[in-house]
Amino acid sequence: MTKYIFVTGGVVSSLGKGITAASLGRLLKNRGLNVTIQKFDPYINVDPGTMSPYQHGEVFVTDDGAETDLDLGHYERFIDINLNKYSNVTTGKIYSAVIRKERRGDYLGGTVQVIPHITNEIKERVFRAGRETNADVVITEIGGTVGDIESLPFLEAIRQIKSDVGRENVMYIHCTLVPYIKAAGEMKTKPTQHSVKELRSLGIQPNVIVVRTEMPMPQEMKEKIALFCDIDPKAVIEARDADTLYAVPLMLQEQKLDQIVCEHLRLNCREADMTEWKALVEKVRNLSKTTKIALVGKYVELPDAYISVVEALRHAGYAFDTDIDIQWINAEHVTRDNVADLLKDADGILVPGGFGDRGVEGKIEAIRYAREQRVPFLGICLGMQLASIEFARHVVGLSGAHSSEFDPNTPHPIIDLLPEQKDVEDLGGTLRLGLYPCKLQEGTLAYAAYGDEVIYERHRHRYEFNNQYRPIMEEHGFVFSGTSPDGRLVEVIELKDHPWFVAAQFHPEFTSRPTRPQPLFREFVRASLKE
């Protein structure tokens, strides 16, 4: 029988529900259980694919091409599993599915209502996650905060699941905040009490309360929360701010969260062996070297927009006992005149993906600097396209070379729409998305990084290198080191006369893991260390 764990949040958003869910997933996996995990987002967008990163942070892409919440990146990195389109569900997806069924006549003329039709659709997404993966445990994080009107159908659905599958097969974990009032020198439990009261008014009694706090919580405070919220004092789990995200599973294990979960759900399984994870955390806390990586992007005020890139850099750093000092460079501020000053301290330069023309010329200047000054460079998606444009303009001499995305009238469309995208009108869900094969050329930096001829990476793009320009670019030392197996699509480019200059059309950051760094990031950091 599959077991179901629901993680909710109260008091404020951004409490770390996703990290809590991911950490618990890691602990249960290390107990020998087959775990899957999903995120329910209460917004009406079908997916975050067309949302601004300022609104939502990074869009994380799964193997099967779903554009999803950034929490799925945490889930994959912590639990070391590959998720799919069933792992991110939004209100928009639920209502779209129900309306489609109504139009098809599936409800036989009945009145379609939030209960039971919307809630049944939500429950089906929970059960499907377990069926598709044969999971022992399905962990579902409910986005938003208890009390928000948007979350109500999701909370009602997870309340009903207890009756559907039996209370011994369902567990509710509620994440709250105990704020520290500096002026009074006190921590306050009242917001937690009210949040749990709100949850209980909706018919959900939490089994565990995970409390975010800046300061250590005295035992009597845990007992007070337990008394007012009607749970065992041992089930009040303190989640203090950690020096590294990867320490959170160990913090939760110390307080026996995984044991509490297994006892409640009647799961007979071994103790979690966290030896390798402890070694990782020990390594992260004692890095002896530092390298400076300039990340040149347009959303640098919000690091969450590049969270998988940042984590992939850190993972690569761990492999070399190196702390990555990221220098956030706003591409809009980069010009020909100031680029040397802005990037003079960088040991490596990275230009990540993005959409829209804001900051494009600044990124091109940063790429030119990396090429001319022989600074290790990694370009991702748009970064690869702009590296091609920079080379075409300044080495090949194709004046006005650009992407037709930014300049439809460019005389040299180095980057152009994929042929299959020419007649596409909708923006949402229509990109080239998900895992595709790439064939690497022997003797190249990319081949050296992967050590394999055919690799698989995740994509999210609509534009592609224009093959008409391949011959002239190659004549000038531009290397097409990776293509689709049929040779039609350019996937990886590099430069002949440069120590380490590689750019990929795909998104390598999505497949990096803390104990298994992604090959391009690993070699980029190695080159940046000047070893």
UniProtKB/Swiss-Prot annotation:
Example of a GO MF term: ATP binding
Recorded catalytic activity of this chain's protein: UTP + L-glutamine + ATP + H2O = CTP + L-glutamate + ADP + phosphate + 2 H(+); L-glutamine + H2O = L-glutamate + NH4(+); UTP + NH4(+) + ATP = CTP + ADP + phosphate + 2 H(+)
EC number(s) recorded for this UniProt protein: 6.3.4.2
Biological process annotations from GO: 'de novo' CTP biosynthetic process; pyrimidine nucleobase biosynthetic process
SUPFAM superfamilies per UniProt: Class I glutamine amidotransferase-like, P-loop containing nucleoside triphosphate hydrolases
PROSITE patterns: GATASE_TYPE_1 (PS51273)
Residues binding CTP, per UniProt: S13, D148, I149, E150, K188, T189, K190, P191, T192, Q193, K224
Any one Pfam family match given in the protein's UniProt record, by short name: GATase
Gene Ontology cellular component list: cytosol
Broadest EC class assigned to this enzyme: ligase
Activity regulation, per record: Allosterically activated by GTP, when glutamine is the substrate; GTP has no effect on the reaction when ammonia is the substrate. The allosteric effector GTP functions by stabilizing the protein conformation that binds the tetrahedral intermediate(s) formed during glutamine hydrolysis. Inhibited by the product CTP, via allosteric rather than competitive inhibition.
Keyword GTP-binding found: no
Domain Glutamine amidotransferase type-1, chain residue ranges per copy: 292-531
Residues binding L-glutamine, per UniProt: Y54, G354, L382, G383, M384, Q385, E405, R462
Positions bound to Mg(2+): D71, E141
Binding locations of ATP: S14, L15, G16, K17, G18, I19, D71, R240, D241, A242
UniProt pathway: Pyrimidine metabolism; CTP biosynthesis via de novo pathway; CTP from UDP: step 2/2
Family: Belongs to the CTP synthase family.
NCBIfam families linked to this entry: PRK05380.1, PyrG
Subunit-level organization: Homotetramer.
Further remark: CTPSs have evolved a hybrid strategy for distinguishing between UTP and CTP. The overlapping regions of the product feedback inhibitory and substrate sites recognize a common feature in both compounds, the triphosphate moiety. To differentiate isosteric substrate and product pyrimidine rings, an additional pocket far from the expected kinase/ligase catalytic site, specifically recognizes the cytosine and ribose portions of the product inhibitor.
Protein name: CTP synthase
Origin species: Geobacillus kaustophilus (strain HTA426)
